[in-house]
């Protein structure tokens, strides 16, 4: 909106921006207090590209290898390597034949990811009918079957099942209740990889804040909004502890 010439004021409840992506700095150490995984880097790239910039203009990104390590209740561990080829080799080593399933699964996951990113998330989210399009109609069974059902049909090793079900847990959902279409997150995980921002996730927040300020956005911390002022069907302003805007 600021880029289009509108006056924009951002009212922030806390003393700093970021919300859950805040950072604790103590004794020379920095701790991410919320999100730690930098997934789906292409979406962040698109955001900065809208303003003629790149994420690397603001912070240093490093792809993690291994991406992460899963520790099971029995004490077993699986360190997930970076890159589809390496992950496929790991699956094949643990369960011969599972690599073939994984390759097919990830190609389907990539298609779902591209569909979601390029066509679905651009919609306003006002109706479930926004999901109806040729790309989703042909995948209707994936909306009525769970991702756990699909994974457990293709992989027998319990540990590998848990690895493939992890992205659903990452979304805060149960794999048994998550539509199989959301296998798209497996592509985000194994295809696009897990990245780390040098200095922590707060660097992304700081980059967005700098960008907003360069566009003329006025940012007011310590301004909790108490009420949205509505007249008729129109929002006329917001009431805070420090005045009305």
What are these regions (language model features)?
Residues 1-114:
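N-terminal glycine-rich phosphate/pyrophosphate-binding loop and immediately adjacent elements
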Residues 17-19, 171-172, 227-229:
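Flexible loop/turn segments at secondary-structure boundaries
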Residues 11, 162-164, 220-221, 240:
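General beta-strand structural signal in soluble alpha/beta enzymes
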Residues 184-241:
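Helical element adjacent to the flavin cofactor pocket in flavoenzyme catalytic cores
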Residues 11-14, 179-183:
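Active-site-adjacent bridging/hinge elements
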Residues 73-75, 240-243:
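Glycine-centered tight beta-turn/hairpin loop motif at sheet-sheet or coil-to-beta transitions
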Residues 73-179:
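Rossmann-like flavin
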């Amino acid at each position: 909106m600021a880029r289009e010439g509108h006056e924009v004021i951002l009212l922030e409840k806390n003393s700093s921006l970021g919300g859950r992506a805040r950072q604790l700095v103590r004794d020379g150490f920095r701790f991410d207090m919320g999100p730690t995984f930098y997934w789906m880097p292409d979406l962040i790239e698109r955001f900065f590209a809208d303003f003629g910039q790149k994420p690397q203009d603001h912070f240093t990104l490093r792809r993690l290898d291994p991406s992460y390590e899963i520790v099971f209740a029995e004490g077993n561990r699986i360190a997930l390597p970076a890159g589809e080829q390496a992950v496929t080799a790991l699956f094949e080593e643990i369960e011969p034949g599972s690599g073939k399933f994984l390759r097919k699964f990830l190609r389907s996951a990539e298609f779902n990811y591209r569909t979601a990113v390029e066509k679905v998330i651009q919609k306003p989210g006002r109706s479930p009918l926004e999901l109806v399009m040729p790309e989703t109609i042909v995948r209707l069974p994936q909306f009525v079957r769970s991702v756990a059902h699909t994974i457990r049909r293709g992989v027998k090793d319990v540990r590998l099942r848990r690895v493939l079900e992890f992205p659903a847990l990452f979304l805060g959902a149960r794999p048994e209740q998550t539509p199989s279409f959301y296998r798209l997150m497996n592509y985000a995980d194994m295809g696009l990889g897990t990245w780390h921002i040098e200095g922590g996730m707060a660097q992304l927040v700081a980059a967005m804040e700098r960008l907003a300020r360069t566009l003329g956005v006025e940012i007011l911390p310590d301004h909790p909004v108490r009420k949205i002022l509505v007249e008729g069907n129109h929002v006329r302003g917001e009431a805070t502890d420090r005045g009305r805007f």
